[in-house]
Amino acid sequence: MTEPKILTRGCGKVKISLWGGWLARLERSVRGAVPACWAFYLPVASVLVIPRIICEAPTAARLPALIHHRASGRLSLIPAGYVLNLPELIAPISDDMKAVDAVIRGRLDSEVVLIRTIADYIIGAGGKRMRPAMVLMMARALGYQGDHHHLLAAVVEFIHTATLLHDDVVDESDLRRGRETANAMFGNAASVLVGDYLYSRSFEMMVEAGSMRIMQILSEATTVIAEGEVLQLLNVHDPDVSQERYLQVVRYKTAKLFEAAAQVGAVLAGATAEQEAAAAAYGRHIGTAFQLVDDVLDYSGDAQALGKNVGDDLREGKPTLPLIWVMEQGTPAQRELIRNAIQTGDADFAAVAEAIRATGALEHAQQAASAEADIARRALDILPISVYQKSLLEFCAFAVNRDR
């Protein structure tokens, strides 16, 4: 990673207090207005830590969440919007990821040409591959030396891809990862059936791993994900959804597969019960953070960078966290605007975006994501320090500071 420039001009006096050997707080007295929050970059021992207390600025579009340590011996400040480079984060497992891609390509083989065509289309669209990377990274972080993690990482990617195929049909989406969705290209029926094929193929591959515990984790995950899909369906066009009810959907629909991916990696490595629980907690909370940032990006991101239409959640009548916050904290007029937008899926996007901005809804969602990432980071304290543990920590930074 290219080290960011030191940014101190105009920031006034910086005070740092240490607690328990870790940087716990950054206090700042500011001369004049500062148009962004700052995260801090403390080079120590190549370990990444998330601060519990951060400085605030009302005009910040994105809040800082993380600090990154390297062995250069000095403190730097970096903008809150600083985005980590995902390929660099997964560099320690780059060979493993290539092996996983080979497994994916091989296991997509089918005598039915349409299955290969659709599966190749959606898998070939790319994506972050965070879930399979999590299997690999957690297994390596706990000392795994075999190669079954390639198979299981591919299983996790197949499950994820199946959910995308089904999601796009349910949501009637037409754009994903910067190109037409599979259902837009090949029709709803074919997309659903190929999703079913990928689920079936993933279970076939699970059996090869020879672990009932791993099968239990992944089969439970697929059940919970399906429950999350149904819960989300019940929430659509309902403006009275609470934050807790929404977060239940996030935990079921999105975070559960992150949780399963990390947990499978731990089990494969022969983790203790305590390590397995910590791995599951890490995945669950980083998955939640990931989805909450998606909520933010749906109202603040760029369609080309995201690879999907900005405002899709609103058009689909989905009450995500920014909208729920306006319903709870907005003026009567703002609440009525959002209520109508959720109920109809047809509203003035600019007016909705202004209500979200005025109530600080994006900042609230970003802070919630940062809090989840902090919990994920602390779950990794049980792991031995290694390049793999460091990358898992850096995933926390990527999850909350990404722009796509």
Predicted regions and their residues:
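Extreme N-terminal basic, low-complexity initiation segments
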Residues: 1-13
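Position-driven detector of the extreme protein N-terminus
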Residues: 2-3, 23, 98
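All-alpha prenyltransferase/terpene-synthase fold signal
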Residues: 15, 27-33, 45-404
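Short hydrophobic targeting helices and cationic amphipathic motifs
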Residues: 7, 38-42, 69
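Intrinsically disordered, low-complexity, charge-rich segments with an acidic bias
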Residues: 2-5, 43, 50
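Tryptophan (W) side chains
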Residues: 19-22, 38
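Short, low-complexity, intrinsically disordered N-terminal modules
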Residues: 8-10, 22, 51
